[in-house]
């Protein structure tokens, strides 16, 4: 992978009819949105303080290959993964970025398919705060780096593959967001993933999206 940090490049969305998922709410309303098929967790430490767990729901029916990569890196089943890595880039009111499991500074990363793998699709958008998307260095350069949104960055739609949503632990995400950074958006205090893994989902459930 070439030198220099991976930059979040600007992202258009194509939502196929096959991606639509419906479920009945408690009051008989129909929820619309992608279905969570698996979950992963990150236990986070800032400096020497354990600050809690981030749980991310993953949309395996929409982007199965991207989800498979993320889950395998969370479990470490290939012998490498997110455990011990850090959030290396933090921009308040925009996003936090992590997943550089090779160099730790935003210039590296690797997927379970090889150094990089192609963009799977752009069926999901960056709908608001807490959505999880692949960081890249341009088209078809997905590896292990990812980011969690802290706004609704619609300009990233069509450029970065969205594959998950934080369903628990946004207080932890915001704790990372509030860390002081240097001139390169690197946190001055290490924000580390001290443990990670998979949480099985016995019954898939819908993350509701108003404009789905």
Swiss-Prot record:
It holds the Pfam family Pro_isomerase. Coiled coil: none annotated. GO terms for cellular component: cytoplasm; extracellular exosome; intracellular membrane-bounded organelle. Expressed in kidney, skeletal muscle, pancreas, heart, lung, liver and to a lower extent in brain. Residues 41-198 form the PPIase cyclophilin-type domain. Inhibited by cyclosporin A (CsA). It is found in: Cytoplasm. It comes from the Eukaryota. Its main location: cytoplasm. One of its GO terms (molecular function) is cyclosporin A binding. It catalyses: [protein]-peptidylproline (omega=180) = [protein]-peptidylproline (omega=0). It is an enzyme of class 5 (isomerase). GO terms for biological process: protein folding. PPIase that catalyzes the cis-trans isomerization of proline imidic peptide bonds in oligopeptides and may therefore assist protein folding. Belongs to the cyclophilin-type PPIase family. PANTHER family: PEPTIDYL-PROLYL CIS-TRANS ISOMERASE, PEPTIDYL-PROLYL CIS-TRANS ISOMERASE C. This is Peptidyl-prolyl cis-trans isomerase C. It comes from Homo sapiens (Human). The lineage of its organism: Eukaryota, Metazoa, Chordata, Craniata, Vertebrata.
């Amino acid at each position: 992978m070439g030198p220099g940090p991976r930059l979040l490049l600007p992202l258009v969305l194509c939502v196929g009819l096959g991606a639509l998922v419906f479920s009945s709410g408690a009051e008989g309303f129909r929820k619309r949105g992608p279905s969570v098929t698996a979950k992963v967790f990150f236990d986070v430490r800032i400096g020497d303080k354990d600050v809690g767990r981030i749980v991310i729901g993953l949309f395996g029916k929409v982007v199965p290959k991207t989800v498979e990569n993320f889950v395998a890196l969370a479990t470490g089943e290939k012998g490498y993964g997110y455990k011990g890595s850090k959030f290396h880039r933090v921009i308040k009111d925009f996003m936090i970025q992590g997943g550089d499991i090779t160099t730790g500074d935003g210039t590296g990363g690797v997927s379970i398919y090889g150094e990089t793998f192609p963009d799977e699709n752009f069926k999901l958008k960056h709908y608001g705060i807490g959505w999880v998307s692949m960081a890249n260095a341009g088209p078809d350069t997905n590896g292990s780096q990812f980011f969690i949104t802290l706004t609704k960055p619609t300009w990233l739609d069509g450029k970065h593959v969205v594959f998950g949503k934080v369903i628990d632990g946004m207080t932890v995400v915001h704790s990372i967001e509030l860390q002081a950074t240097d001139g390169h958006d690197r946190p001055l205090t290490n924000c580390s993933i001290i443990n990670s893994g998979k949480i099985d989902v016995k019954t898939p459930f819908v993350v509701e999206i108003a404009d789905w």
